[in-house]
């Protein structure tokens, strides 16, 4: 392609798809992902989304639990920011069509997981990641071009990133966003 995309997103999991959806309408987006649409870590995530959405919960309690579970190694202000955004993220995903488990009363069926003093994990059985990816893909249909190819290098010119090299050739962009996950392999 000779004309660059407005943005090239490397990674087709939850982070990359959410970024694609947050771009203004009309933005030319390429999502470059190494695997087929259902591959990667995101669809395999079984747990829930911890968010203070229950009647016995609060953002402050969520942050307190998270900081305690972090055994002193988490940045407290970052924890508070992330916990504060949790309820809005759950609502946003619901507005996109994510189907989370609900009780007989129609309210979210919250699970209590490790480190939580109250039940706060929103889930879809044991396939929460798969459901979130499904909802994001559905909501983003037609918003981005998916390029199924492994990225092998960042393309640089005059001190800035201008795209990515893939196994199938270059993909140029005015901006490049890395949403590749895989941090767990850091220690492998």
Where in this protein do the model-derived segments appear?
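Conserved N-terminal/central alpha/beta ligand/cofactor-binding core
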Residues: 34-160, 179
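N-terminal Rossmann-like FAD-binding beta1-loop-alpha1 element of flavoenzymes
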Residues: 7-31
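Ligand-binding pocket scaffold of soluble enzyme catalytic domains
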Residues: 16, 161, 170
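Glycine-/small-residue-rich beta->alpha transition segments that form the dinucleotide
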Residues: 173-175, 179-184
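Core beta-strand elements of the Rossmann-like FAD/NAD(P) dinucleotide-binding domain
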Residues: 2-5, 167-175
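A conserved FAD-binding loop/helix module that cradles the flavin
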Residues: 186-188
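Residue-level detector of alpha-helix initiation sites
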Residues: 13-14, 36, 127, 184
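Structural detector for helix-capping/boundary residues
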Residues: 12, 149, 174-175
């Amino acid at each position: 392609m000779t004309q660059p995309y407005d943005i090239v997103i490397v990674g087709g999991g939850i982070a990359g798809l959410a970024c694609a959806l947050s771009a203004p309408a009309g933005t030319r987006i390429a999502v470059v992902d190494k695997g087929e649409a259902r591959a990667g870590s995101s669809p395999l995530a079984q747990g829930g989304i911890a968010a203070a959405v229950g009647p016995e919960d609060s953002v402050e309690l969520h942050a307190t639990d998270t900081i305690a579970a972090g055994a002193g190694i988490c940045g407290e202000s970052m924890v508070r920011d992330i916990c504060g955004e949790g309820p809005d993220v759950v609502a946003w995903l619901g507005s996109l069509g994510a189907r989370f488990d609900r009780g007989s009363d129609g309210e979210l069926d919250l699970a209590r997981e490790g480190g939580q003093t109250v039940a706060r994990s929103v889930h879809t059985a044991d396939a929460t990641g798969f459901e979130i990816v499904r909802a994001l893909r559905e909501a983003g249909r037609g918003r981005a071009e998916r390029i199924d190819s492994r990225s092998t290098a960042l393309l640089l010119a005059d001190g800035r990133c201008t795209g990515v090299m893939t196994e199938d050739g270059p993909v140029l962009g005015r901006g490049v966003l890395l949403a590749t996950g895989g941090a767990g392999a850091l220690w492998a």
